[in-house]
Each structure stands twice: as structure tokens, then as C-alpha cells.
């Protein structure tokens, strides 16, 4: 089911603020809306901040790839869960659950190729691939081009934990919007000093991360369990490496310390290479007081209960794998 708002267009001469996520999808949404000359500034937000009302949203705002918040002028999304969560159809909520990215929803809404004839080559295909996680094993283990850019822009890769870069992620995003609008090739973009600084660190960590994952992994039937509790440092890596290293697994479970080792966190996900897992991860985590969506979720436990809960959850996953 899709909600569309085909009659709502930006007011002539009006400039809006874009509120989006700081990732590849957010970047391309910003490029598209800048091409239309309808945004003057960008705010990057986390989905939970939107749900918790921490971001003030009003009639001068356009949101993309974020939970729907009433009050925005237009809201674009492609998450099926939002159709359920938003419940009532809102005239300003453009949601196409079958679209691979929110950028694709924006692109199609404003007229596609006819409206955007000058986009950087390959950018729409790249954002669709990244946001739908349609990566190959080779993309994951030897990333280059747009795939590499998407991994260094993903906060979950974790590069920011290890270095104060020359410019912040926000400044980099703003720079990349302009470089993509100037129709630079992806090769040119990867040569930018502020991008190269991040890709160099990515590859430096990549080797250590692969060795760490292989060392910490234990296979439980179709599930790979990664226990990082004895690791002093968890190296930065794209979040799909575990699936490329263990192609026989269709799910992963990461065991991590909570804040100050006061509790234990389980982060559970489905493989993007072996897409045979049937269990609803979000529902499983919710049953333990956590949450998530169909393909990924987290829950946390008191340290003393974590081993019992781990065996229980492994059993449930393998029963439904």
C-alpha cells in the first residue's frame, strides 16, 4: 500500500529546510532537492530523535527517510513499517514501500529523468543499491566506487570513534552535496582529501576487523554468534562483513557490553547474502523488551541473566531459521 501526495508541490520561490539521515540516501535526497532549488539548509537527524519529538518540525521543512512527523510541509519515505506506524493517510506523506530508497521516491515524485537530466552518472543506481543493501560479497570485502563511499558515510561503520577528522561528518556531507551537483565522477569524489582520509582509515581497519570477526565468531547452525565482550577495541568495519565471511549463516547475533559494562546487549540481524531467514527479528527482540524491524533489532539484559537468555534466543532463532 502506498500513500502519495501528488497534488502537493513546493510553493513557487519558497526555500525549505531538509531534515534527513546522514547517509547515502540523505546525501542523494539533498542533491535532488538542491537541483530543484527548493532547500536552503539541511539538518541531519536520527530516526529515534524524530519519534521522540527532539527535532522541531514545521511547515518550512521537508523530511526524507525518517519517521513521519506531523507539521512538515512534505515527508518522503519508503519504509513499510511507516505505513503501519503513521496509520492515517496524511496528504503530505509520500510513502512508497516498494521503492528501494527514499531518494528514488523523491526522484519519481518530481518527474524522474525529465526533471533531473544532469545527475552524476550512476548516483541513483548507487543509492538504491546502498539503501536496499543489495551488495555482493565482492562489494562487501573489496569495496570501491559508490559502494565504498556508502560504507564510509554509514555511521554504523564506526570510523568516527577512532579519529577526529579534518572536517566533521556534517561538513563532509555538505561538501559532497555540492560535488555531486557539480557532476563530479565517483572517482573524483573518492580523491577528495576529506573522503580519502576516511577511506584510508577504513581500509586500515578492514584487515583488523576481518581477523577480529573470524576470531570472535561461533557458528550455531545457521546463526553466527559474535562475542565482543573480551575485545578491548572493536575495529571499524561495514556491518555486512560478517555475512561475507560466513556465507552459510543467514543471521548474526552480536554480543556487546552496555554502558560501563552494566548490562549486555544483543544485536541481531539477517544476512543480506543468504536471505533465507524467516523470523521477524523486531518481534523477537520486542518479546525481550527490546525492538527493531523485520531484519534487525536489539535487546539488553542484566549481565547475570545474559548467558541463559543467549541460549534461549539462539534456540528460538534456529527453530525458525
Where does each model-flagged region fall?
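Hydrophobic, aromatic-enriched interface-forming segments
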Residues: 130-222
Amino acid at each position: 500500500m502506498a500513500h502519495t501526495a501528488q497534488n502537493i508541490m513546493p510553493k513557487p520561490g519558497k526555500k525549505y529546510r531538509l531534515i534527513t539521515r546522514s547517509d547515502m540516501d540523505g546525501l542523494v535526497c539533498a542533491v535532488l532537492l538542491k537541483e530543484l532549488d527548493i532547500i536552503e539548509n539541511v539538518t541531519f537527524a536520527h530516526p529515534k530523535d524524530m519519534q521522540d519529538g527532539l527535532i522541531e518540525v514545521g511547515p518550512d521543512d521537508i523530511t526524507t527517510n525518517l519517521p513521519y512527523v506531523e507539521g512538515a510541509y512534505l515527508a518522503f519515505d519508503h519504509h513499510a513499517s511507516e505505513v503501519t506506524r503513521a496509520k492515517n493517510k496524511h496528504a503530505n506523506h509520500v510513502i512508497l514501500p516498494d521503492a528501494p530508497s527514499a531518494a528514488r521516491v523523491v526522484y519519481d515524485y518530481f518527474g524522474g529523468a525529465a526533471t533531473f537530466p544532469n545527475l552524476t552518472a550512476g548516483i541513483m543506481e548507487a543509492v538504491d543499491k546502498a539503501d536496499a543493501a543489495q551488495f555482493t560479497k565482492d562489494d562487501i570485502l573489496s569495496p570501491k566506487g559508490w559502494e565504498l563511499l556508502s560504507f564510509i558515510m554509514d555511521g554504523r561503520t564506526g570510523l568516527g570513534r577512532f579519529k577526529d577528522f579534518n572536517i566533521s561528518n556534517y561538513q563532509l556531507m555538505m561538501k559532497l552535496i555540492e560535488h555531486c551537483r557539480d557532476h563530479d565522477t565517483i572517482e573524483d569524489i573518492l580523491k577528495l582529501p576529506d573522503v580519502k582520509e576516511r577511506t584510508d582509515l577504513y581500509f586500515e581497519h578492514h584487515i583488523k576487523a576481518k581477523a577480529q570477526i573470524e576470531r570472535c565468531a561461533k557458528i550455531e547452525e545457521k546463526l553466527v554468534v559474535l562475542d565482543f565482550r573480551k575485545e578491548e577495541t572493536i575495529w571499524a568495519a561495514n556491518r555486512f562483513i560478517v555475512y561475507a565471511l560466513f556465507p552459510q549463516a543467514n543471521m548474526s547475533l552480536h554480543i556487546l557490553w552496555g554502558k560501563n559494562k552494566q548490562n549486555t546487549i544483543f544485536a541481531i540481524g539477517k544476512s543480506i547474502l543468504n536471505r533465507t531467514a524467516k523470523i521477524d527479528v523486531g518481534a523477537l527482540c520486542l518479546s525481550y523488551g527490546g525492538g527493531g524491524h523485520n531484519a534487525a533489532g536489539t535487546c539488553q539484559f542484566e549481565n547475570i541473566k545474559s548467558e541463559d537468555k543467549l541460549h534461549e534466543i539462539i534456540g528460538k532463532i534456529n527453530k525458525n531459521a
